[in-house]
C-alpha cells in the first residue's frame, strides 16, 4: 500500500500502489434504488410458518446474513419485495441505541425485510460490498447526526438518498472489497473463539460445581451484602479513574472517587440485568442499583465465591420481582444458598475457572484491537 500525498478530497489517504487518480462522486439516490419492507399481519399465524427469510433490524450485526430468526410463507412474501442474494441491508429504526447505529449486512439468500430495514439495490457502478464498507465507516455518524424522532431515532429514504458517496473503479473496488472481507473474516474467527471459550468455561464450571460437596450456608452467613450509593448522573464523566456500576452489565460512567475496594464481587440489584454477577479487580463506585459482597469470612475464598455465584447467575436472576423496573430484594439475596467445600478445593476450582476467564478477557481485548484496526483502515482507505 502507499500513502497518497495529494490534497484532493477525492483521493483516499491510503491506497493500493497500482491505483491512482481521483474517485468519482455521486449520491446514494442516484446509484441505488432504496427499499424498506413491511411486517406481514401476525393475526394470520400461517404468515410466519414458511421458509422465506424475513430480516429484522436486530439481525444485521455481521458482514453477511444467511438466515433470519423468523421465516414467512410464500403467500405473505407476495406483498413484499424478494431481495436477491448480495443485497446490502441496514437498520433504520431504533438508532438511539448504540448497538443498532451503523449496523448492516449483505444477504446470502433471497430475503424479505421488515419496515425497520432499508435495502440498497445497485443501479450504477458501485458494488454492494463497497457500499457495506462505506457504511461501516460513516454509519455511526449518520445515525447520530441525521436520524430523526423523539423517543425513537429513525432514518428515511429522504435522508439517505441525499448522502454523497465517492467511489473508485470496479477493479479498485473489488480489491478493496477482498481486503476488507479478510479483515471481517479475521474478526469473525476471533468472535467465534471467544464464544467457544465462554461455552467451555460454562461447561467446566457446571461440571465442577455439580460434583462439589461441602457445607450449605446462606450468602448472609459468610458475607455482608452492601447496597451502593446513588450518584447524580450530572456528576458522571465518560472517562475517569473510577468506573460506576449501577444496575447494568457495563459501567454507567466514571467518577472521581470510589466506595468499594478492588477484588470485590458485585451483583446488579435492579433493571433488566438484575442478578448479573461481576468480579471487580479495581476500586469502583457502587451505585444505588448495585450490591457488593463484602467482609467475606476467612475460610471462604473470594474468587471461589465469585465463580460459584456466577455459575448460579440464572438462579439469582430468578429472585427478581416487579415488571417495569425489576429488582432483587436484599433479604432474598441474603438467603441464597452457597456450597462451601474445603479451602483446598475452593482454590483448585477458582484457579481453573479464573484461568479460563482470563484467557477469554485477553482474546476479547484482541478482538477490540482488531475492530479498532479495521476502523482505522476504513477511514484511511475510503472517502
Indicate residue ranges for each PLM-predicted region.
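Short coil/turn segments at secondary-structure boundaries
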Residues: 41-49, 147, 233-240, 321
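A short beta-sheet element
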Residues: 56-57, 67-136, 246-312, 320-322, ...
Amino acid at each position: 500500500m502507499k500513502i497518497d500525498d495529494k490534497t484532493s478530497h477525492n483521493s483516499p489517504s491510503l491506497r493500493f500502489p497500482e491505483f491512482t487518480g481521483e474517485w468519482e462522486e455521486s449520491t446514494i439516490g442516484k446509484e441505488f434504488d432504496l427499499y424498506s419492507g413491511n411486517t406481514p399481519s401476525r393475526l394470520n399465524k400461517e404468515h410466519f410458518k414458511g421458509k422465506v427469510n424475513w430480516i429484522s433490524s436486530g439481525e444485521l450485526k455481521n458482514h453477511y446474513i444467511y438466515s433470519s430468526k423468523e421465516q414467512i410463507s410464500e403467500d405473505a412474501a407476495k406483498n413484499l419485495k424478494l431481495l436477491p442474494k448480495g443485497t446490502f441491508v441496514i437498520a433504520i429504526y431504533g438508532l438511539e441505541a448504540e448497538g443498532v447505529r451503523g449496523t448492516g449486512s449483505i444477504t446470502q439468500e433471497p430475503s424479505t425485510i421488515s419496515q425497520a430495514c432499508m435495502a440498497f439495490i445497485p443501479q450504477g457502478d458501485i458494488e454492494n460490498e463497497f457500499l457495506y464498507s462505506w457504511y461501516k465507516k460513516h454509519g455511526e455518524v449518520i445515525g447520530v447526526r441525521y436520524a430523526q424522532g423523539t423517543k425513537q431515532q429513525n432514518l428515511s429514504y429522504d435522508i439517505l438518498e441525499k448522502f454523497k458517496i465517492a467511489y473508485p473503479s470496479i477493479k479498485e473496488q473489488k480489491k478493496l472489497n477482498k481486503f476488507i472481507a479478510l479483515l471481517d473474516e479475521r474478526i469473525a474467527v476471533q468472535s467465534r473463539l471467544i464464544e467457544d471459550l465462554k461455552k467451555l468455561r460454562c461447561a467446566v464450571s457446571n461440571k465442577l460445581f455439580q460434583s462439589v460437596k461441602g457445607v450449605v450456608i446462606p450468602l448472609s452467613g459468610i458475607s455482608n451484602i452492601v447496597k451502593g450509593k446513588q450518584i447524580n448522573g450530572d456528576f458522571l464523566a465518560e472517562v475517569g479513574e473510577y468506573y460506576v456500576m449501577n444496575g447494568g452489565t457495563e459501567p454507567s460512567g466514571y467518577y472521581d472517587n470510589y466506595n468499594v475496594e478492588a477484588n470485590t464481587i458485585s451483583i446488579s440489584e435492579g433493571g433488566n440485568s438484575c442478578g448479573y454477577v461481576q468480579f471487580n479487580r479495581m476500586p469502583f463506585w457502587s451505585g444505588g442499583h448495585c450490591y457488593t459482597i463484602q467482609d467475606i469470612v476467612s475460610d471462604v475464598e473470594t474468587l471461589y465465591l465469585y465463580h460459584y455465584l456466577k455459575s448460579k447467575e440464572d438462579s439469582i436472576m430468578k429472585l427478581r420481582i416487579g415488571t417495569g423496573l425489576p429488582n432483587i430484594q436484599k433479604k432474598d439475596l441474603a438467603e441464597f444458598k452457597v456450597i462451601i467445600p474445603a479451602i483446598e478445593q475452593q482454590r483448585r476450582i477458582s484457579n481453573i475457572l479464573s484461568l479460563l476467564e482470563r484467557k477469554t478477557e485477553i482474546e476479547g481485548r484482541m478482538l477490540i484491537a482488531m475492530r479498532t484496526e479495521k476502523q482505522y483502515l476504513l477511514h484511511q482507505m475510503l472517502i
